[in-house]
């Protein structure tokens, strides 16, 4: 089979319905818009969320929550990610060199998903209890900075 021999699967491509192209087409005159009314006019129709004058749902429901401006964003790393690095010491400097984080100001949290096979020393912002237990079990050290 060659590229010029490829064909679409039967029924996978539908022809575009051409409206307003004469009465014989079956889609002429009103062009599937019906007779008169707001929706038949050019530019007609109502805005999104309009419910005919009834107070719309988005105004009936109360406002809720907010986004805290003081929220800290952490880059999440799992033990399996640290294992792939295959290094004895893991800190911000190493992660920047390995292009895992963009700069040393980024906050990093280590989670316990996966496992490690050798002792590693970790100097990062946050470490979960399960990750800390796994690291210390193999003789590694965890330092939260």
Curated annotation (Swiss-Prot):
The keyword Cell cycle does not apply. SUPFAM superfamilies: Ribosomal proteins L15p and L18e (SSF52080). Residues 42-51 have a biased composition (Gly residues). One of its GO terms (cellular component) is large ribosomal subunit. Part of the 50S ribosomal subunit. One of its GO terms (biological process) is translation. GO terms for molecular function: rRNA binding; structural constituent of ribosome. It comes from the Bacteria. Residues 1-18 have a biased composition (Basic and acidic residues). It comes from Mesoplasma florum (strain ATCC 33453 / NBRC 100688 / NCTC 11704 / L1). HAMAP family: Ribosomal_uL15. Binds to the 23S rRNA. Residues 1-51 are annotated as: Disordered. Belongs to the universal ribosomal protein uL15 family. The gene is rplO. Keywords: Ribonucleoprotein, Ribosomal protein, RNA-binding, rRNA-binding. This is Large ribosomal subunit protein uL15.
């Amino acid at each position: 089979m060659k590229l010029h021999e490829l064909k679409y699967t039967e029924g996978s491509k539908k022809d575009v319905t051409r409206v307003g192209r004469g009465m014989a087409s079956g889609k002429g005159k009103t062009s599937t818009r019906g007779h008169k009314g707001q929706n038949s006019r050019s530019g007609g129709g109502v805005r999104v969320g309009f419910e005919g004058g009834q107070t719309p749902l988005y105004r009936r429901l109360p406002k809720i929550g907010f986004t805290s401006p003081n929220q800290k964003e952490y880059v999440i790393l799992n033990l399996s990610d640290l294992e792939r690095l295959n290094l004895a010491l893991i800190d911000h400097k190493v992660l920047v060199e390995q292009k895992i984080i963009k700069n040393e100001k980024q906050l990093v949290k280590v989670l316990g998903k996966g496992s490690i096979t050798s002792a590693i020393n970790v100097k990062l912002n946050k470490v979960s209890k399960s990750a800390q237990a796994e690291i210390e079990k193999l003789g590694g050290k965890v330092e939260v900075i």
